[in-house]
Amino acid sequence: MKNSFGSLFSFTTWGESHGPSIGVVIDGCPAGLELHESDFVPAMKRRRPGNPGTSSRKENDIVQILSGVYKGKTTGTPLSLQILNTDVDSSPYENSERLYRPGHSQYTYEKKFGIVDPNGGGRSSARETACRVAAGVVAEKFLANQNIFTLAYLSSLGSLTLPHYLKISPELIHKIHTSPFYSPLPNEKIQEILTSLHDDSDSLGGVISFITSPIHDFLGEPLFGKVHALLASALMSIPAAKGFEIGKGFASAQMRGSQYTDPFVMEGENITLKSNNCGGTLGGITIGVPIEGRIAFKPTSSIKRPCATVTKTKKETTYRTPQTGRHDPCVAIRAVPVVEAMINLVLADLVLYQRCSKL
């Protein structure tokens, strides 16, 4: 099982949803980065369950630094972080020992490895993403020294959709960070949709958009280390992610070259792009404008409606998520800080690569 991501700035997550704890080991973080346990609080608070429109599971998600920091600064040695699981209830998963939950990885894990922990989804649970967010905090602090910043937001939920990318501004950042749904969309409209989902015992997918600050360092490693390829790999590894696009993405397939091509223009003494249909990269290398993209998330399969399945003895039956089950009606909401974390982890890796690219 592959549990690590990254090359020079890499991380390995460990633990299961209903185990005693989960955690992450970061390797390659440069020495001298100021880091305290309090630095993790804002990001972990955004991702943790118990917020409006999310799972009722209540975890404190307090990050403990176990190694790699001395007197408030990273030492360059492996940085180990731990998060305790404090609100575990495995009772809704008792039936999972005899049948396969539709739409979940339980069946494929069991057939591949011969054994699987079904409680809370085990290793495949979105609980694992808390580790990614913790690692992303370290990457974000490192990138701040390079003047690189990432912002993600819920841009589509049901009939609510933002038709285009938004530009980073203090007002937008404040609006997203103060929204319980991490979105510039109207909060009351989102709540109406979530209430309807709850009443219907159903779930819904969503789209997360992201944008970075302009990146002037020409990050990216052709041919197989292209920025957008690495971002796609990172973001599509998030549970429930089902689609990725950079810039105009799939819409570019319906455009003419005269419409799509971004002209070069001068901005003072700097060369830049007049438009950003490419999404911030040419040849897989950043070009000094923001990276823009979107990720689509499927509706969760954990819904309190009956669905056809089979038992482990190959008998057809039905399965319904127990009323006591605790699941998100829209996983895209809590995925916003996870998206930011994975982007920051990719960019931190590429910044270190860039330092090795030429004399």
From Swiss-Prot:
Residue positions binding FMN: 123-125, 283, 298-302, 326
Keywords: Amino-acid biosynthesis, Aromatic amino acid biosynthesis, FAD, Flavoprotein, FMN, Lyase, NADP
Recorded superkingdom: Bacteria
Enzyme Commission number(s) from the entry: 4.2.3.5
Cofactor(s) for this UniProt protein: FMNH2
Entry GO CC: cytosol
Pathway membership: Metabolic intermediate biosynthesis; chorismate biosynthesis; chorismate from D-erythrose 4-phosphate and phosphoenolpyruvate: step 7/7
Cofactor note: Reduced FMN (FMNH(2)).
Gene Ontology MF: a single term: chorismate synthase activity
EC primary class: lyase
Residues reported to bind NADP(+): 47
SUPFAM superfamilies in the cross-refs: Chorismate synthase, AroC
One of the protein's GO biological processes: chorismate biosynthetic process
Reactions it catalyzes: 5-O-(1-carboxyvinyl)-3-phosphoshikimate = chorismate + phosphate
Assembly: Homotetramer.
Physiological role: This reaction introduces a second double bond into the aromatic ring system.
Family recorded in the similarity comment: Belongs to the chorismate synthase family.
Annotated HAMAP family: Chorismate_synth (MF_00300)
Protein name: Chorismate synthase
Gene: aroC
